[in-house]
Amino acid sequence: MGGFDYLQKGGTGFTLQVKKPQIRRVVQTRPAAPSPSANKATPRTVPSGPQKKTPETASRSVTGERGFSPSKRRLTPLRNRKRPTPEQRLSSDDDDDGSDTDTSLELRKRARTGESAEPDYGRRLRSLKAFSGDETRSLPIVHASEITSVQKPGKFKPAFENMNQTSEIFLQYPSATPKERYEAVVPRDDDEFKPLDDIVQVIETVTQAYIPEDELDEFNNESTGIKRRLRRALARGSEREFRESVKDYNVAIERLRRSGSIAKKLDATYRLSLPHVERILTQIYSRTVSPRVDSLRQYENGTDNVYGELLPRFISTIFKETGLKSNHVFVDLGSGVGNVVLQAALEIGCESWGCEMMQNACDLAELQQAEFKARCRLWGIAPGKTHLVRGDFLKEQSIIDVLKRADVVLINNQAFTPQLNNELINHFLDMKEGCQIVSLKSFVPVGHKIQSRNLNSPINLLTVKQRQYWSNSVSWTDVGGSYFIATKDSSRLKAFSESLA
C-alpha cells in the first residue's frame, strides 16, 4: 500500500449502508522502546500511510472514522543491510495497546498537532492564471474517473442502487479551470481509491480555505448546508440527493469565483493549512503513485535498500523550526517519489529541489511533478518551482551547485553508513553561512570541541540543536525520537583560530 493510500483506507473511507461511525482496531505486536543505538536501523517498505489527526473540517471521513495525514518521506538507500519484514501501522493514537515502555508512552502522549508553517506575508498564494477566465481548455490532470475506469477497471461497483445509466459526476474547483470528472462508484476492496469520499473532502477543504465568512452558511448550515446534505444523501443511499448537492455546490463556487470573493479570500491568506496541503498531495499521489506502487515493491524486493519516511506533520514542523519561507531554497537529498519536495513547494511556496538515484522512484516522482503543476492550478494555488534530479546527490553537478545557495537541506540519514555521512560533511564546506541542515543523526559527535588537532574538520563549521519529534512522525515506529538542526556558522572556528594567533 502506498504512502497516501492510508488516507483512502482508514481516514476517508465510507460504506453507504453504515449510518453511524465505525470503530476499527488493528492489533499489532510492538517492539520494546528502542535505545538510542537501536534507532540506527529503521527499515521501511514502499511508501506507506500517514497517521496524523487533522482538523475535522478538512479530514473527517463521511463515516466519522479518523483521517490520516498524507505525505511521506523516503529514506535514502543504504547498501548491504538486511530488511526485516515491514509492518503496516493502521492504528491511531487511541488504539494504544499499552505494551510500550514508560518512555515510549511518554513520547506517544506528547504528540503534537500544531498548525502548518507560519504566515509568509511575502508570498502570493493565488495563481493569477488560474483565475484569469482563460482556462477554457482542460488541464492535463488525471481525472478521478480514470482511476476507476481505466487504471483499475473491475475493482469498483455502483455506489447507489438503481443508478442512472451514466455514473459520471463533475466537480468544480475554486479556480476558473474546467471541472474534474468522477464516477459514482465505490471500491470492492476498502484499500482502493474512494471517489465519493474524495468529493466530500474536496468540498470540506474548499469550504474551509476559499469561502468568505459571510457566505459560509450555505455550506455549513447544520440543516440545509451543502456539506450536511451530502452526508445525508450518502447515509440514505440517495443518488438523486447526492447529485443535487454537488450541483448546488458547483453553482455556488462558480458564483463566488465570478464575483471575485474567492480570489479576495485567497489574496488575504498567507499560509496554507496542513489539511489543505494534505488534501492536494493525497489527490496527486492517489492518481499517480498508488496505481503503480507495485513497481516500488518490485524494486525494493530485489535490493538491500532500507526505506523510512518522515510524515507530513513532522515535515511541516521542520519547515517551522527552520523558518523556511517562499524566498528560500529547499533541498531534499534522497527524495524518493518526491513527496517532501512537493510539500515544500506547496506549503511554503519556495524553490524546492530533490535528488534520487532509484529509477522506479524517479519515474513516479516525475508523474507526481506533472500532476502537481496541473492540480495546483486546479486549486488556484501558485506553488514554488520544483526540480527533481536523477542520480547520486554526491555527484550530480546541479545538486552540488544548488547546495551552495540552499537555505534548508533535509537529509534523512537514519540508516546512512558512516562513510556516506562523512562524504556528505565535505559538501558542507561549500554551503553558505546560515544554511540549516536537518537530519535524524547528528553530523557532529556529542561533546565535540574545536581543538588544534581537528582544526580543519568541516564539522567545526556547524552549530547543532537537538529537537524532539513526537509519535506518528516517522513511518517505522509510533514512538518519538530526536532530530538535529545544524546551522553553518563559522564564527566559533574563526574565534578559536584568532585565539591561537
UniProtKB/Swiss-Prot annotation:
A Pfam family that the UniProt record links to this protein: DOT1
Superkingdom of source: Eukaryota
Binding locations of S-adenosyl-L-methionine: 307-310, 330-339, 356, 392-393
Compositional bias segments (type: Basic and acidic residues): 105-121
Known catalytic reactions: L-lysyl(79)-[histone H3] + 3 S-adenosyl-L-methionine = N(6),N(6),N(6)-trimethyl-L-lysyl(79)-[histone H3] + 3 S-adenosyl-L-homocysteine + 3 H(+)
Enzymatic class: transferase
Molecular-function GO term, any one: histone H3K79 trimethyltransferase activity
Annotated GO biological process: DNA damage checkpoint signaling; DNA repair; methylation; subtelomeric heterochromatin formation
Positions of region (Disordered): 1-121
Keywords: Chromatin regulator, Methyltransferase, Nucleus, Repeat, S-adenosyl-L-methionine, Transcription, Transcription regulation, Transferase
Domain DOT1 positions: 180-501
Main subcellular location of this protein, as a coarse class: nucleus
InterPro entries per the UniProt record, alphabetical: Dot1 (IPR021162), DOT1_dom (IPR025789), H3-K79_meTrfase (IPR030445), SAM-dependent_MTases_sf (IPR029063)
Biased composition (Basic residues): 71-83
One cellular-component annotation, GO: nucleus
Location of the protein in the cell: Nucleus
Regulation of activity: Ubiquitination of histone H2B to form H2BK123ub1 is required for efficient DOT1 methyltransferase activity on histone H3.
EC number: 2.1.1.360
Family that this chain belongs to: Belongs to the class I-like SAM-binding methyltransferase superfamily. DOT1 family.
Function: Histone methyltransferase that specifically trimethylates histone H3 to form H3K79me3. This methylation is required for telomere silencing and for the pachytene checkpoint during the meiotic cell cycle by allowing the recruitment of RAD9 to double strand breaks. Nucleosomes are preferred as substrate compared to free histone.
Other known facts: In contrast to other lysine histone methyltransferases, it does not contain a SET domain, suggesting the existence of another mechanism for methylation of lysine residues of histones.
Name of this chain's protein: Histone-lysine N-methyltransferase, H3 lysine-79 specific
Organism phylogeny: Eukaryota, Fungi, Dikarya, Ascomycota, Pezizomycotina
